[in-house]
Amino acid sequence: MSFIIKCLDCGHNAPYYPTSTNCPKCNSQWREAEYDYEMIGKTLLPKLAGRGNDLWRYKELLPVRNPNISLSLGEGHTPLIRAVNLGMMLGCPNIFIKDERQGPTASFKDRQAAVTIAALKEAGITELVAASTGNVAISYSAYASRAGMKLWAFVTSLVPSVKMREIALYGSQVIKITGSYDQCKQVAAEFARQRRLYLDMGARTITSIEAMKTIAFEISEQLTNIHGPGENAPWRTPDWYVQAISGGMGPLGVYKGFREMQQMGWVDRIPAFAPIQAEGCAPMVVSWKKGLDKAETISSPKTRIETLATGDPGRSYEFLKKYVDSTNGAFESVSDEDAFRAMHVLAKMEGISAEPAAAVAFAGLFKLIRAGIIKPSDTVVVNCTGHTMPAEPGVLGDNWSRDIKFPSTMETPQEGLLAALTQVAPERFPKIVIVEDTMEARRLIRRILQSQGNFTIMEAENGRAGLELIQRELPDLVVLDLMMPEMDGFAVIEALRANPETAVIPIIVATAKELTPDEKNRLGGHIQALMQKGDFLNDEFLEEVKSLIK
C-alpha cells in the first residue's frame, strides 16, 4: 500500500515506521496517515462486493503494507441495528446502534489492537506496552498472543479483577497501579522508555486512529444498504454520530473516516459529532461550554465509570473541538446515574447489554433529544462501544434476584415447591393496567415501565375491556388513553369513580391531543397525572409511576 505520514503541526511528510513516534522535522507527536485518495476513491468501491466482511475490506486505506490474514480474529463489520423501541420512546425513529460489542473481545478497541498488532508484526516488533482501564488491554492481549508478542499491561487498581484475570489469561504481564488513569499512563510511558519498548500512545498512535476510521466506513456502507445512496454521492451518512469519550480517540478516528470518504467523493457531507463524557470527569465538555481552545484538566475524577476517567485530554480536545464546531455538533455530559439508567433502558427495550461507558453515549442521546438539539427527523448513529460482561456491581441494585431455599431433604414435598414458587409469583409485583387502543402505544408504555422496575402489566385495547379488567384485577395503577372509540377514557374514569373499590386507584392519563378547557374540567380531581404522548421519556412520567405505586 502507498501512504505517507503527515505532521499535523508543520506539514512535513515522512515514511511510516511504527517505532518512529515523532515528526523528524518539528518533533511533534501528532501525525496522521495520508493516501492517494483520488486513485483509491475511483477504484476501491467496485472491489468491495467481492471482499470479506471485516475491517480489512478497506485495506487500501490502512497503514499495513501486507495485511496478514492469519492474525485476524474477525474484527470489524459489526452490525448497525435500528433501535425501533428507543425510537418510539424518543419520538426519533431513525436511531441506529453500531454494535461494537460484537467484536472478538466485545469492544471497539478490537479495531485498534488488530491494526496496531498487524503493523507491529510487519515491522518485526515483539514487545509492547499499553496503559488501560480494561478494554484496550484485553484487546491487545488477545491479538498479541495470536501474533506471538509480549504485552506489558499497566492498569489502575480500580479495573475490575475479572478484567485483570482475562488480560493475564492471554499471557500478558499485568502491572496494577494504585492511582489515577493519567498516572498509570505516566508510569507505563516511563517503563517503555527505560526498556526501549513500543508504547501505545492512544490518540497519538497512528494505527489507532486509522483503525477507528473503519467505523465510519462501515456506518456509511451499512446505511446505504438500508436507505439507499446519498443525494449527491454513492454512500450515505447519518445526521449525527454519538459516542462516549475518555481521551477522545474513537471520534477522532471516526471523523477522519468520514473526512476521507468526502475527499474521495463517496459521501457528500460529514455528520454532526456529539462526544459525551461522564459528569464527574468531563474536562472537554466543561472547556467547550466555556468556549476554551485548550482543555482544563481534572486532577481528581469523581465518576464510578473508571473507563472514562481521563482528567487530562491534552491536544485531543483541540482537534475534537474543531470537529464538533465545524459539524455543528455538541459536547455533552451526563451523570453516572443517568448512564446506569440508560443501561437498563437499552437492555430492557432493545435487548442490548452495554457497559456503563457505552451507556453514557445513550444517556447523552436522551439529553440531546430532550434539549431539541437532535431533531425527530434526524438519522442518528450511537456507538455501543462495549459489552457489560460481567454486569458491574451497583448497576442492578440490591434486589435484582430472588432466592428460593429448599429444605435439606432428599425429596421436596409438593407443598414446599408450590410455596417456594409463590415467592417469585408476579402477583408480588405492583399491578399496572394499560388501557390504550393503539397496539404500538401499548407496547411502548409497557417497555418503558419494564425498563424501570418489576411490574405485573396487563393490557386492554378498548375502554370497555379496560373497565372490566380494572374491576376484576384492582391494580395499583392505571395508565389510560382518553381518545378511544365507543367507550372513551372519560367514560372509564367516571365508571371507576362510581365504584368504591376502584375509586381509589390512581390514574395517569396519556393523550396525543391538546385538551380543551371543558375536557380538563371533566378530569379535574379524578386523575393523578396528565401526560402527552411522545414525552414518555420525561422523568415526570416515571417519577409519577414510582410515587403512585408505593
Residue spans of the language-model regions?
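PLP-dependent amino-acid enzyme catalytic core
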Residues: 1-422
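Conserved acidic carboxylate
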Residues: 436
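Charged docking surfaces used in two-component/phosphorelay signaling
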Residues: 443-451, 521
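Helix N-cap/capping motif at the beta->alpha junctions
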Residues: 459-468, 489
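Short amphipathic alpha-helix used as the core "switch/output" element in two-component signaling
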Residues: 468, 490-503, 522
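Active-site beta3 strand of CheY-like receiver
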Residues: 473-479
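Receiver (REC) domain active-site loop signature in two-component systems and cognate sites
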Residues: 484
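Hydrophobic/aromatic residues positioned on beta-strands within the core alpha/beta folds
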Residues: 510-511, 533
